[in-house]
Swiss-Prot record:
The modification N5-methylglutamine is found at Q252. GO terms for molecular function: translation release factor activity, codon specific. It comes from Oenococcus oeni (strain ATCC BAA-331 / PSU-1). This is Peptide chain release factor 2. Belongs to the prokaryotic/mitochondrial release factor family.
Length: 372
């Protein structure tokens, strides 16, 4: 790009940095980090491992918030200095380096800005993501497998760990259901944008007549909750446990021992399953976390409905409502029905490029809370 254009881009980035700086108390961040590090250096810190891990995680979050801002601030300062040098004496190699660094810093700023939109209580938690095909037979189960691939690709691109806790293959193709644990900081905050019904339109490869088909898949997303984060009483007599032989995605890594666990919460009928661990105990522990997450979600839904009734507002019920359409025929377009964001890059979306949709959703969600 021309030097004048580069300077305009740098100026825009500096404005964003100044805006972030006005809302960021670096001294308070440093004080909180120092306080936590002092606790970590005390004898007996690991006596309560759960509490210790919580302090470590909190410290890492604070450091990440501080260090990512300082890194961005330094990058923009370096870009400004490089542009000044080029204004005095043009250098082709330095100019190319400036263009590359501007592009990288713009992406880093977009990522930082996205993180600032995560304001909900459990946004920093791991996510539990469930995939359930709707009616439509093979076409729907195949669409479910496409979404499974899309979310795993997205998670891998963000360095999140993916654990497949449950995976049931379709009769002909695709999957009947799947449950993923997306492990990493802010996983739930990003993925809560995906909860709802995803509609898919294409010429079906399973239809010999080559007709256009519409299929639906429901995605449910919940935060993974630790025992100290929420109190949900689950009576032992209310839970039925079944064990079975585990098998990985597509029938891989089949276990000859019944280590997989399925829990049924009798009062609500909620069913969860885990087959990712090598022992029944490990899978039961994960399944219990998933059950708590589902019970929490159920209670939150009730509270939101009651609040909406009292305030006279219309509740946005994501589960059971269509949130996004993916059209591959007669044209190619993916459109979010809440934020209005759309793109013709269907291949990129199916390869996991969901960040523009997530960003648009978070901004839309914030605007719903603060309409002015």
């Amino acid at each position: 790009m021309e030097l004048a254009q580069a300077r305009n881009s740098i100026s825009d980035m500096q404005e964003q940095i100044d805006g972030f700086r006005s809302t960021l108390d670096l001294d308070a961040l440093d004080a909180s980090i120092a306080e936590n590090e002092d606790k970590m250096s005390q004898p007996g810190f690991w006596d309560d491992q759960q509490s210790a891990q919580k302090i470590i995680d909190e410290t890492n979050t604070l450091k990440n918030r501080r260090d990512s801002f300082l890194s961005l601030q330094k990058s923009v300062e370096d870009l400004t200095a490089m542009a000044e040098l080029l204004s005095e004496e043009d250098d082709a190699d330095m100019h190319a380096e400036l263009d590359t660094d501007i592009e990288k810093t713009e992406k880093d700023l977009e990522k930082y800005n996205l993180n600032q939109l995560l304001t909900e209580k459990y946004d920093s938690n791991n996510a539990i993501l469930e995939i359930h095909p709707g009616e439509g037979g093979t076409e729907s189960t195949d669409w479910a497998s496409n979404l499974y691939r899309m979310y795993t690709r997205w998670a891998q691109a963000h360095d999140f760990k993916v654990e497949v806790t449950d995976y049931q293959t379709g009769d002909v193709a695709g999957i009947d259901s799947a449950t993923l644990r997306i492990i990493g900081h802010n996983a739930y905050g990003f993925l809560r944008s995906e909860k709802g019904v995803h509609r898919f339109v294409r010429i079906s490869p399973f239809d010999s007549a080559g007709r256009r088909h519409t299929s639906f898949v429901s995605i449910d997303v919940m935060p993974e909750l630790d025992d100290d984060e929420i109190e949900i009483e689950i009576k032992p007599q209310d839970v039925k446990m079944d064990v079975y032989r585990s098998g990985g995605a597509g029938g891989q890594n089949v276990n000859k021992v019944s280590t997989a666990v399925r829990l049924t919460h009798i009062p609500t009928g909620i069913v969860v399953a885990s087959q990712v661990e090598r022992t029944q105990y490990g899978n039961r522990d994960i399944a219990m976390k998933m059950l708590k997450a589902k019970l929490y979600e159920q209670e939150e839904q009730k509270r939101e409905e009651e609040h909406a009734k009292l305030s006279g507002t219309k509740l946005d019920v994501a589960w059971g409502s269509q949130i996004r359409s993916y059209v591959f025929q007669p044209y190619r377009m993916v459109k979010d029905l809440r934020s209005g964001y759309e793109t013709g890059d269907t291949d990129g979306v199916m390869d996991g490029n969901l960040d523009p949709f997530i960003n648009a959703y978070l901004k839309w969600k914030l605007s719903q809370k603060n309409p002015e």
